[in-house]
Amino acid sequence: VLGEDFVMTSLYPDTTVWVRDFTYHMGDPLMEYYFSHPAFDEYPVVGVNWFAAKYFSDWRTKHKNQANADNGMAPMPKFRLPSEAEWEYAARGGRDMATYPWGGPYLRNAKGCLLANFKPGRGDYYSDGFTYTAPVAQFFPNDFGLYDMAGNVAEWCEDAYADATVPITWDLNPVYYDDNEPRKVVRGGSWKDIAYFLGTGTRNFEYQDSARSYIGFRNAMIYLGRSSGREFR
């Protein structure tokens, strides 16, 4: 059982990231309110390192399956971080050659509106309508119905980072584990990144014990069964 002090200091979101990452960038109000104020309930979590994201996944699994047991339901597969390959597959939304999750190579729609929360130019944090993070689902989803696979906050993946993982991973279900590698894969780009980092094929990393105001995560789960049988007909 983890001690309360350890959980509070190591696994809860670090609210000081807003001041540490961007001094005077509205840091004090966000540091005070982002994690706890109901006005931010629909915003993505930030300030969590890789370990904290994994701990939350385990915590979520435990409580979900306890609720299932209390209601006479079967346990679910565990929540976890997606592998880098899973994340990219999800981001592409079924479009193998998609530059961005919305499918096309363009950053604006026909009306000239940006298609994600990111920084289109030097110092330009405002053109997308949001100065920093945005509430989830403010932009259109990809063809899998997934929101914010590009921009808003970058996302932790399960994999350790290597400059080229192809020679060292199994091609059927590639994931790269290395407990001695402190760098972990981060994907998707964020509100403070330029368009390059929003690309579905763009790779990046952060150190596993680092919490940032522009990195969050989403959970994945093994799906039992298949979506349809049409591909076998």
Which functions belong to the PLM regions below?
Residues 219-226:
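Short beta-strand-to-coil "C-cap" segments at the C-terminal boundary of structured domains/repeats
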Residues 5-204, 211-213, 228-233:
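Functional-site microenvironments in short loops/helix caps that host divalent-cation chemistry
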